[in-house]
Amino acid sequence: MTARDFKNYLEPLREGKNLLGFSGGLDSTCLFHLLVGENIAFDIALVDYSTQKQRLEIIQHAQKLAQTHHKKCYIHYAPKIARNFEMQARKVRYDFFETLIKEHSYKHLILAHHLNDRLEWFLMQLSKGAGLNTLLSFQAYEKRESYAIVRPLLYTPKDTLKTLAKDQKFFEDDSNSSLKFKRNCFRKHYANALMQHYSKGIIQSFKFLDKEKERLYPLIPVSQMHGITFFKHSHNALFMVDKILKKKGYVLSFLQKEEIKHHFFSLEIAQKFIIEKDKEHVFIAFKPQKTLSMPKDFKDRARRLDIPKRLRPVLYAEFLKQPTHDFLTRFKQSLMDL
């Protein structure tokens, strides 16, 4: 594999600061050396879950590798995870990455997901019953609120990485062979055989499906004002809500998506987000941390302007920061201008 195979994903990385999620395994080790070979500047971040026998050796190796190539190496020692390991480990990992991104102004988070990872996810979601958006959840370039996730290896089979990394030192994670994890069951019983015999066709199918997704889920103009994100209602509304919340660092579950549809886009999610709609728009906002008592005149003006009830506390909290007589009118006008 050469830069030609993933060059489309390298160009954004040539500007701004980059952070590579590193584990010491085959995938991230291979990506580390590919990025070095392409003169992409980046630092690395590693999470120690205290689950691997070679954990201290992995940490020392990561630090030495970073030092050799003049890169920063951030390490997070995660607390013990008692249950739901995969889900909790993912949360710990992404929280750590996002903390570093905010503190050090990284523009891109580089992850080493490859074609086998994508197929395993696809098969798992297919078995549960999922739409195209969920089946293709992994994207090579994924914009978040203040940074972008870049996955340069998303169309690269794991066997290709093994060939590339044959002279590199990397560590096998023992948990990858444990069948108590659902992903490993799908890998052993289904994905490995499919990749062994049909990898070229699988690559092409994912490329076709990605293009179909772009056509089926066109991006809708999104605006933001006074801490509220909003867009015009359409048949893609749930897709847009999912995409916006991902940018804000929150991933909706299947049940939450069903709940949003059941409540017709008027509810609270995870006691953290407000989702609301009017006749033409869908709104997303962080729920205010404190319940504020709104004066009667503010409530009356919001009611006369047909501003949905769930949004009024959000707007009032913002109004207190910048009180102006036309505060609500300007917000209403921004909806009309969308």
UniProtKB/Swiss-Prot annotation:
Record: residues binding ATP: S23, G24, G25, L26, D27, S28
Enzyme class: ligase
UniProt keyword Nucleotide-binding, yes or no: yes
Entry keyword set: ATP-binding, Cytoplasm, Ligase, Nucleotide-binding, tRNA processing
A GO-annotated cellular component: cytoplasm
EC number: 6.3.4.19
Classification via InterPro entries: Rossmann-like_a/b/a_fold, TilS/TtcA_N, tRNA_Ile_lys_synt, tRNA_Ile_lys_synt_N
Subcellular location field: Cytoplasm
Source species, domain of life: Bacteria
Molecular function in Gene Ontology: ATP binding; tRNA(Ile)-lysidine synthase activity
Listed GO biological process terms: tRNA modification
Main subcellular location of this protein, as a coarse class: cytoplasm
Catalytic activity from the UniProt record: cytidine(34) in tRNA(Ile2) + L-lysine + ATP = lysidine(34) in tRNA(Ile2) + AMP + diphosphate + H(+)
Presence of the UniProt keyword tRNA processing in the record: yes
Family assignment from sequence similarity: Belongs to the tRNA(Ile)-lysidine synthase family.
PANTHER family, per database record: TRNA(ILE)-LYSIDINE SYNTHASE-RELATED
Function text: Ligates lysine onto the cytidine present at position 34 of the AUA codon-specific tRNA(Ile) that contains the anticodon CAU, in an ATP-dependent manner. Cytidine is converted to lysidine, thus changing the amino acid specificity of the tRNA from methionine to isoleucine.
HAMAP family hit by this protein: tRNA_Ile_lys_synt (MF_01161)
Domains: entry comment: The N-terminal region contains the highly conserved SGGXDS motif, predicted to be a P-loop motif involved in ATP binding.
Protein name stated in the entry: tRNA(Ile)-lysidine synthase
Organism: Helicobacter pylori (strain J99 / ATCC 700824) (Campylobacter pylori J99)
Recorded name of the encoding gene: tilS
